[in-house]
Amino acid sequence: MMKLLNKFKSRRRSLDDLVFDSLNTVFMLLLCIVMLYPMLNTLAVSLNDAADSVRGGIFLWPREFTLYNYEHVFGQAQLIQAGFVSVMRTVIGTALSVFCTAMVAYTISRQYFVLRKFTTLAFVLTMYFNGGLIPTYMLMRELSLIGSFWVYIIPGIIGVFNLIVVRSFIEGLPESLFESARIDGAGEFTMFFKIALPLCLPVIATISLFVAVFQWNSWFDVFLYNPSHANLSTLQYELMKILQNSNASISSGSAADAFTRSQGGSTSEVVTPTSVRAAMTIIVSLPIICVYPFLQKYFVKGLTLGGVKG
């Protein structure tokens, strides 16, 4: 009797698991569709003839395939310069931010650091309170950062959230490693570069992704500090201007105004703000999409281990 009852419970449990797995699979598929469709639709519009796109009806694949939208984008000297600035601020900003954040995190993770609690509190307070937009602008002006590339790097060189994550990760490392190194005569810099930094690679990869995405997607600091410096514009800022022009063209209600003829009045090769916007969106999204799979294995591990003591 007991065997029969256990067999019945096991069969019922298997049925419940099957129903749960099926519903979970359907839900995840719907979620994937919701996330992928906007990107696939944007890709289809960017690969479709601009004049044909005005008719609408493009969903997952282009109706009249063309690469002219991308040729038009890459043919703009300003966009090439903006792309160079975006790459430079992402590379330099990420490297400096990760290095400085890791160094400060190591410092405040040491129990014998006298100002450990005060320094931590000072950083944490900046997460909740700031000086405001106008005082920040005045500070950047007094520091002679307006009109400079470094205005993109220095103000956000240390992210408090990233700092807390790295500090918690370092605090979780065996203290015996540092004690042994100290007995052997190693100084703080040696312990940081030879012990802490190599062991922090998972969390370093995690915050590197955070900082890189932030730097690559930033446009408001360009709008605020360097709107009149074309040589310091970024791809995201140029995309924002294209979006504004597109909205202005749509609001005017004139389809003719939406077309930009690119070759001396030729009607065979045209682009619209919508087609250029789609191409620009794919271009600025592609680097992050390509980088993320390589950092994904570190992402959950680094964030989880770094947040245990946070």
Label each region the model flagged.
Residues 2-310:
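A hydrophobic, multi-pass inner-membrane permease signature
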